[in-house]
Each structure stands twice: as structure tokens, then as C-alpha cells.
């Protein structure tokens, strides 16, 4: 069983696992990417053309790793960044350096109509503001086309703590969340927009004296 966590609690657990325990961040990214691939493989998804939408933070780094693993399996995958890559976190840049050696070329702009599956790796638990207007428009266009979406950790636009929509949210068919289920996936619009929530253990650790603000428990895959 695992507990529900707020965005702040999840970030504290991340920091403890990486900074105190010494688990390399790239190991967690790889495990998260492999967990998403497990879900893709277990589902009946059309992999004719997978579009990975990646942000500039750690969620985006997960997305780049997912794109790489799919590409290595021979899947037709397009990787599109949302935002200026020059401002991406180091975790994203490290993943980019790897895919460049693999030969996977980033797409400047992709047509949602051509995609048979969309991977949402734009924003995760770190979202704390209303989404930019341009991103809101893109999300609304994607929702209108109604393609199957797998969200990485949390659907973009959903507040991981409250479940509120921050301007617009990408509606997911499936959400693969890591370590602990975020409260926002069970509250308000977050419950509806997250689709089928699958919890995956990627090796995160918690301090012995860590106190959860909520007591609910859910099964872990």
C-alpha cells in the first residue's frame, strides 16, 4: 500500500532520495521511463506514430527518455519540446545528449492528427501557476482531436495537490504516476482528467520520521 502525497511532499521525497540517499537523478528518470513503457506495452495502444510532448523540467526529462526507449524499439516516435530548450534543466539536457547519439531528431512542430498516441511529459508535480496562454491553446486543440494520451506522473495543467485545472489541462486516457499517488489525481477535475491512474514504484525512499499529511492508502503496481 502507498499513501497519497501533496506536491510539496513529493518534492521532499525526491530531494531526500537524490540528495541525502545519493540515488542519481538519471537512474530515477530511466526507471520512470521504463515504467511508462511497461504500461504502453501492456495496453492496446496504436504505436504507428507516437508523439512525445516534453517540457523543460524533470517531467520533460522523463519524456525524452521515453522517446529514446521507444525509438530503440523501432517505434515511429516524434519528440517535440514545449518551450525554449536552451532554458531546460540539466536533467533534460543530459537526456538530449543521449538521444542525439541515438539519432533521434527533435520535431519543431508536430501534427496532432498524425499521432496515434500522445505522451504528455510537459508539466508534473512542479506546476504552481496558470499555464501560458499559448500552451493552453495547444492543449485545447489536442483535447478537441481526442487522441489517446498517457500522462507522465500528472496530466499537464492539473495541480498535483488540489486537482484544480490551471487554465487548461490535457485529458489523459492513462496516467502513470511514480512512487506515491498525488492527491490532485483523486480530487476535483484531476480525478476525471487523469483517466486510469497506474502507480509505479521507481525506488523513491522516505526518511524514517517523514509525516504524511494524509492517511489514505492505495495499492501500488
UniProtKB/Swiss-Prot annotation:
Which Gene3D superfamilies would you find in this protein's record?
YjeF N-terminal domain
User: Mind telling me which PROSITE patterns this protein's record contains?
Assistant: YJEF_N
Q: Which cofactor does it need?
A: K(+)
EC number in record: 5.1.99.6
Q: What are the record's GO terms for cellular component?
A: P-body
GO terms in the biological process aspect are:
deadenylation-independent decapping of nuclear-transcribed mRNA; P-body assembly
Q: Which named protein is this?
A: NAD(P)H-hydrate epimerase
In its UniProt entry, the species of origin is given as Leuconostoc mesenteroides subsp. mesenteroides (strain ATCC 8293 / DSM 20343 / BCRC 11652 / CCM 1803 / JCM 6124 / NCDO 523 / NBRC 100496 / NCIMB 8023 / NCTC 12954 / NRRL B-1118 / 37Y)
Q: Which gene encodes it?
A: nnrE
Amino acid at each position: 500500500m502507498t499513501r497519497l502525497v501533496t506536491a510539496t511532499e513529493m518534492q521532499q521525497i525526491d530531494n531526500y532520495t537524490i540528495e541525502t540517499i545519493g540515488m542519481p537523478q538519471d537512474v530515477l528518470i530511466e526507471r520512470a521511463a521504463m515504467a511508462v513503457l511497461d504500461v504502453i506495452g501492456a495496453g492496446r495502444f496504436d504505436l504507428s506514430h507516437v508523439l512525445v510532448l516534453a517540457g523543460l523540467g524533470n517531467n520533460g526529462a522523463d519524456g525524452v527518455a521515453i522517446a529514446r526507449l521507444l525509438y530503440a524499439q523501432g517505434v515511429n516516435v516524434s519528440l517535440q519540446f514545449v518551450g525554449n530548450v536552451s532554458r531546460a534543466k540539466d536533467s533534460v539536457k543530459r537526456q538530449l545528449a543521449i538521444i542525439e547519439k541515438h539519432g533521434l531528431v527533435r520535431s519543431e512542430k508536430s501534427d496532432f492528427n498524425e499521432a496515434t498516441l500522445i505522451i504528455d511529459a510537459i508539466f508534473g508535480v512542479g506546476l504552481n501557476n496558470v499555464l501560458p496562454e499559448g500552451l493552453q491553446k495547444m492543449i485545447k486543440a489536442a483535447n478537441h482531436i481526442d487522441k489517446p494520451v498517457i500522462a507522465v506522473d500528472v496530466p499537464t495543467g492539473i495541480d498535483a495537490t488540489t486537482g484544480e485545472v490551471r487554465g487548461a489541462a490535457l485529458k489523459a486516457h492513462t496516467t502513470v504516476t511514480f512512487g506515491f499517488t498525488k492527491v490532485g489525481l483523486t480530487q476535483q477535475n484531476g480525478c476525471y482528467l487523469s483517466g486510469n491512474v497506474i502507480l509505479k514504484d521507481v525506488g523513491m525512499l522516505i526518511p524514517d520520521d517523514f509525516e504524511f499529511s494524509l492517511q489514505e492508502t492505495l495499492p501500488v503496481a
